[in-house]
Amino acid sequence: MGAFTKAAYFLLHPNQLRSIVQWKVWHEPVHRRDPSKETETEKACFRHLELTSRSFSAVIQELNPELLMPICLFYLVLRGLDTIEDDMTIDLAKKEPLLREFADLMEIDGWTFTENGPNEKDRELLVHFDDVIAELKKVKKPYYDIIREITVKMGNGMADYALNAEHNTNGVNTIEEYELYCHYVAGLVGEGLTRLFVESNLANPALLERMELTESMGQFLQKTNIIRDIHEDYVDKRRFWPKTIWSKYVNTWDDMFKPENREKALQCSSEMVLNALKHTEDCLFYMAGMRDQSVFNFVAIPQAMAIATLELVFRNPAIFERNVKITKGDACQLMMESTQNLRVVCEVFRRYARRIHKKNDPRDPNYLAISVQCGKIEQFIESIFPTQDPKKIALAQAQNSNQTAANTTDNGDTTFLVLSMIGVLFVMGGLMIGAAWLMGARFDMAYEDITARVGTLVNGAAAVSSATVSSIPTTVMHQEL
């Protein structure tokens, strides 16, 4: 977007510019990374982080210092693994062992990988992977063990999918396969992060006993991305929408993108959104377990972005024609709200759930189920943060009683004041009349004079009235029409 186009856009959408400016000016990170105290390999890791994901880089660099480097390295390790899996130029016979043995390779000092295709966007990370390995050697053993264990699980899962000819040819078939794929690429990430949070005492240990909450966090993010990226994946000959869902609406996958099937495609996307929305309550419950503000920000921002993205793609025909994403202004607004507390984040979810409900079409076969799910989200939020808090109601009633009593007191004071003023006037009037009488005033003569003057005025008015009546003719002649 050119400078002139941007200026015109912001003139027409001033609220977008306002949100961006507010975020830039008023956002104060909980923690700030200090590059002056970092080694060269640490600085290199953060450069790789910024090159692979600017959005995640920003929130990672504001984390509590205890988790700053472990989570940065965790992200880079999984990104390196993902870069190998996504590269279609690597032969399967070479790719499978790389994925399965990646956790062992990252223990070899100086190991790098230079065989990615030239167009693979994150190939530089693997070319300089020795920087990541050098820093992995320095992290605390409990953190390293968590990173390694998740890398083993994810590498094996990716290798299994790479060998799955049916998946590679026809994509995902069932909802179970769809959720298993989301587990390997996102659910495991959530598991690793939760264990890191708890190990550092920055999250409630009870989260380890409710791993379904962690799973929902990853599922919600990954499903949202899959729905949003449908056009991009179609162009790349990939299909992640389960056949169990899309086959209800069209005969072939290609039919989803034909203009004449647009309404059917929208109904299919509605069911996909419904499938993602079922994780929202777990996500909100999970966020309540964060004990550190920077960690809360880290988990809340992506979730708020996800619910906003679901609202954007819901019944939006543009997703079948191009890639869509929330505006930068909306993103800044969401980040401002998501870096406060759980109550504010719940309000974000409530707001977007209501927007989804408003966009819902009664002709859509998923209309009722989506309406119910939106209602469940509101009901869950209401159970955490009641809008009619009994304590607040009692306090308001007490304040109203005090105000009523104050008004009653005020009314009594006002009456007393008016009567006092009238009494003062009578007393002052009496004193003045008494003083005049003592000075020799003749009130009897004044009374007679006033009576005579009033009689004269009355008689004169009667005479004028009689003369006027006698001058009016008794008959009025009308001209011929």
Swiss-Prot record:
Q: Where in the cell is it found?
A: Endoplasmic reticulum membrane
Keywords for the protein's UniProt record, in alphabetical order = Endoplasmic reticulum, Isoprene biosynthesis, Lipid biosynthesis, Lipid metabolism, Magnesium, Membrane, Multifunctional enzyme, NADP, Steroid biosynthesis, Steroid metabolism, Sterol biosynthesis, Sterol metabolism, Transferase, Transmembrane, Transmembrane helix
Query: What residue intervals traverse the membrane?
Result: 294-314, 416-436
Q: Which GO terms describe its cellular component?
A: endoplasmic reticulum membrane
**What cofactor does this chain's UniProt record say it requires?**
Mg(2+)
For whether the record's keyword set contains Transmembrane helix, the answer is yes
Q: Which SUPFAM superfamilies match?
A: Terpenoid synthases
According to its UniProt record, this protein's enzyme class is transferase
Gene Ontology terms describing biological process: ergosterol biosynthetic process; farnesyl diphosphate metabolic process; isoprenoid biosynthetic process
Enzyme Commission number? 2.5.1.21
Reaction(s) the record says it catalyses: 2 (2E,6E)-farnesyl diphosphate + NADPH + H(+) = squalene + 2 diphosphate + NADP(+); 2 (2E,6E)-farnesyl diphosphate + NADH + H(+) = squalene + 2 diphosphate + NAD(+)
Pathway of action: Terpene metabolism; lanosterol biosynthesis; lanosterol from farnesyl diphosphate: step 1/3
Which NCBIfam families does the entry link to? squal_synth
- Function as written in the Swiss-Prot or TrEMBL entry: Catalyzes the condensation of 2 two farnesyl pyrophosphate moieties to form squalene. It is the first committed enzyme of the sterol biosynthesis pathway. Required for the biosynthesis of ergosterol.
Family stated for the protein in its record: Belongs to the phytoene/squalene synthase family.
Q: What is this protein called?
A: Probable squalene synthase
